[in-house]
């Protein structure tokens, strides 16, 4: 094969690459615009409907990817240089009939300390963020053994603890908030952050098989004490959370807000799948 023929092939390949670059750049720009538009819509919808999120108004966002090839992003919400909350956004697979990206709202929270906060992040370079609702963690894979660190509190777990199979990604997209939906109803139960051990009626109900439905949750009055317990890492840990607020999107998609170093909202269908709700009947630890 002559050198001239090699030069011709090289020129053709270079031309094809140059022709493809504007297309790829245009696709990336379109995706970025869709993503930014969507997170702004959700942020404003929450801030304008729930007075507790008023600080989100006129705020700024920073975005980071969660894990490798997970199609999940952490959106840090800041105002005047201070963190005031976060969103966790996922992307559903595109279809040939609808190539437009479809984003879903996996979780959102309020407060100074967000999920995967740098203040609690392990200093090891090999720490990988792994998102799965309440089971979210940093995975440290360095020798001699891998172990996990709680993504909300920075608490390290023993090396013997192993994560369950992810649950959040198994939820149908129609059970999650998606593009075009509005926050239509809110219900406040506990305005101030509370410790689940301040009222321990739920401890005496751990063996109960009765279920609290969404309708029953929604009917509770402000001041009601509801505890959500979630077994983590193959039931090595039982994590209790006090329910603070309830959100309803388009009057159909329900999210539950719990106190956990700040306020965090997860889909009700997820919370019900991984945990159990208890209505506390006692008023103090002594009881």
Residue ranges of predicted features:
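Exposed beta-strand-loop-beta-strand "reactive/processing" segments of non-cytosolic proteins
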Residues: 51-93, 131-147, 245-246, 257
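Sec-dependent N-terminal signal peptides of Gram-positive bacterial secreted proteins and lipoproteins
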Residues: 2-25
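A eukaryote-biased signal for long
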Residues: 185-287
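Extended intrinsically disordered terminal tails
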Residues: 1-2, 266
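Soluble extracytoplasmic regions of secretory-pathway and membrane proteins
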Residues: 30-38, 42, 83-90, 107-114, ...
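A short, surface-exposed interaction/processing loop segment used at functional sites
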Residues: 87-135, 149-185, 254-287
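Generic "edge-of-domain/loop-turn" microfeature
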Residues: 22-24, 82, 96
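Short, non-transmembrane alpha-helical segments in secretory-pathway proteins
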Residues: 26-66, 109-126, 173-229
């Amino acid at each position: 094969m002559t050198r001239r023929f090699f030069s011709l092939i090289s020129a053709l390949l270079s031309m094809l690459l140059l022709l493809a670059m504007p297309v790829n750049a245009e696709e990336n720009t379109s995706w970025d615009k869709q993503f930014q538009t969507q997170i702004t819509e959700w942020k404003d919808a929450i801030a304008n409907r729930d007075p507790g999120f008023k600080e989100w108004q006129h705020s700024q966002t920073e975005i980071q990817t969660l894990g490798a090839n997970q199609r999940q992003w952490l959106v840090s919400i800041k105002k005047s240089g201070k963190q005031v909350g976060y969103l966790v956004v996922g992307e559903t697979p595109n279809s040939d009939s609808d190539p437009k990206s479809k984003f879903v709202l996996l979780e959102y929270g309020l407060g100074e300390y967000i999920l995967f906060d740098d203040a609690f992040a392990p200093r090891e370079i090999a720490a990988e963020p792994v998102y799965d609702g309440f089971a979210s963690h940093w995975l440290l894979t360095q020798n001699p053994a891998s172990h996990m660190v709680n993504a909300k509190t920075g608490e390290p777990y023993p090396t013997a603890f192993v994560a369950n199979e992810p649950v959040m990604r198994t939820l149908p997209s129609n059970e999650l908030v998606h593009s075009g939906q509005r926050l239509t109803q809110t219900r406040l139960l506990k305005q101030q952050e509370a410790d689940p051990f301040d009222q321990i009626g739920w401890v005496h109900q751990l063996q109960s098989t009765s279920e609290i439905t969404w309708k029953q949750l929604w009917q509770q009055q402000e001041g009601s004490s509801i505890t959500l317990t979630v077994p983590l890492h193959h039931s090595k840990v039982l994590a209790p959370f006090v329910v603070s607020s309830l959100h309803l999107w388009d009057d159909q998609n329900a999210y539950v807000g719990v106190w956990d170093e700040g306020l965090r909202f997860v889909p009700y269908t997820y919370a019900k799948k991984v945990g159990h709700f208890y209505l506390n009947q006692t008023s103090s630890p002594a009881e």
